[in-house]
Amino acid sequence: MDIRAAEISQILKNEIANFGNEASVTEVGQVLSVGDGIARVYGLDNVEAGEMVEFENGVRGMALNLEVDNVGVVIFGSDRDIKEGQTVKRTGAIVDVPVGRGLLGRVVDALGNPIDGKGPIPYETRSRVDVKAPGIIPRKSVHEPMATGLKAIDALIPIGRGQRELIIGDRQTGKTAVALDAILNQKSANQGTDESAKLYCVYVAVGQKRSTVAQFVKVLEENGALEYSIIVAATASDPAPMQFLAPFSGCAMGEYFRDNAMHALIVYDDLSKQAVAYRQMSLLLRRPPGREAYPGDVFYLHSRLLERAAKLRDANGAGSLTALPVIETQANDVSAYIPTNVISITDGQIFLETDLFYQGIRPAVNVGLSVSRVGSAAQTKAMKKVAGKIKGELAQYREMAAFAQFGSDLDATTQRLLARGSRLTELLKQPQFAPLKMEEQVVVIYAGVNGYLDALPVARVRAFEDGLLALVRTSHGDLLETIRSSKDLSDASTQALKAIVETYAKNFA
């Protein structure tokens, strides 16, 4: 066997030429202890706060506590297969999620992984979950209405695009139902061609039963609303870090639309459960507890989340992100820690009360305690004209009703006021999944505030409303179209509307 020296030297030269000198360096640490969804890791000296780390079995976690000799990591998954002594490696990336139009119509977990069995998500880009909210200069004051389709809200507590309006109440008072109706009401706008009228919806379910989330998705699907919605679900069986992260992930998905000159609505259902999950994580990380055992930065947790809802100025694309956070109270106690925090952060609140709910007033909005700090800036001119009166009349009615309990001999004016108030209260009731368009609400409220219901028994108000709407939809579509396109109630429209309502009221028996 002969050895060719030239050939060997050529092979060696080729090998040397193709030799790659890039060695991949990954910083790894070791698990010191693990339990209750928290791992203590030694050796990750350069890890960043909020950075994703990966355990041996592929489960991911987030570095939250950076201490002198170890790192406190919260685990996004089960900690059963993580053992003491296992290696943990840095990923070099702060926690991020996929964002873009590809997520519409899908159900994802807090990390943006699909959980609806419809295959992988074709996302456009990834975005960090916890980013800084827009400053003062890029913002613009809220001035466009965000119609919910609920008379009680659109007339009395108007919500604008870019606003944060809290929905607060005890369990089983219809908080989710209000948010669901607001999502369903965007269907006609999203099916139209006007891009500026479209409103994409993100629903974040935190700590809810899986059956509840499945039911919610089913209702959206049946009503054709899933195609413009994203569902982010961190259910009751998910680890606390996932429940803590879900609202931030949903917010990042909503911000994609806001920053690309589109409009989005995000519902956090609910932030009390997120605060409880954050409290659990903080106590397990040995952070000092404060009031009600919540950590000291629980206010900052919610404020940095809700400040990201904004209306941007024209130079920044004029997009918007509207937030409807939900808070569940215990026995109507709105002076507890989390409710007071979120009330002070948001631009108004919708109070839902158990008593009203059981009296059959649904949506069970307490009009006296509810407020929108944006006010009529978020209403169309047409709605302003008819709804201005209803606020005053209902306020007087509530005042008089309190006194009327004590005396039976009331003068005619007071009796008239009480009769009008009870009929207006009846008029503001609305069945679920039946949102009304703005122009239809204007017609109904016009009839109420101008005394056309006063002669009717209260039990007949609903029938009157249904009949009037059916008449206007079938025979007077042009009037509805005029109000819709002009967003105003001109003198001519008012005269036409008056004639229609008068004729209908005479014939209604």
Curated annotation (Swiss-Prot):
InterPro entries: ATP_synth_asu-like_sf (IPR023366), ATP_synth_asu_C (IPR000793), ATP_synth_asu_C_sf (IPR038376), ATP_synth_F1_a_nt-bd_dom (IPR033732), ATP_synth_F1_asu (IPR005294), ATPase_a/bsu_AS (IPR020003), ATPase_F1/V1/A1_a/bsu_N (IPR004100), ATPase_F1/V1/A1_a/bsu_N_sf (IPR036121)
Keyword Nucleotide-binding set for record: yes
Membrane topology field: Peripheral membrane protein
Enzyme Commission number(s) of this protein: 7.1.2.2
Sites annotated Required for activity: S370
GO terms for cellular component: plasma membrane; proton-transporting ATP synthase complex
Keyword Ion transport attributed: yes
Pfam family, one: ATP-synt_ab_C
Sorted UniProt keywords: ATP synthesis, ATP-binding, Cell inner membrane, Cell membrane, CF(1), Hydrogen ion transport, Ion transport, Membrane, Nucleotide-binding, Translocase, Transport
CDD domains: ATP-synt_F1_alpha_C, ATP-synt_F1_alpha_N, F1-ATPase_alpha_CD
Primary location class: membrane
Family as reported in the entry's similarity comment: Belongs to the ATPase alpha/beta chains family.
Summary of the function given for this chain in its UniProt record: Produces ATP from ADP in the presence of a proton gradient across the membrane. The alpha chain is a regulatory subunit.
Protein name per the record: ATP synthase subunit alpha
Native organism: Methylocella silvestris (strain DSM 15510 / CIP 108128 / LMG 27833 / NCIMB 13906 / BL2)
Classification of source organism: Bacteria, Pseudomonadati, Pseudomonadota, Alphaproteobacteria, Hyphomicrobiales
Originating gene: atpA
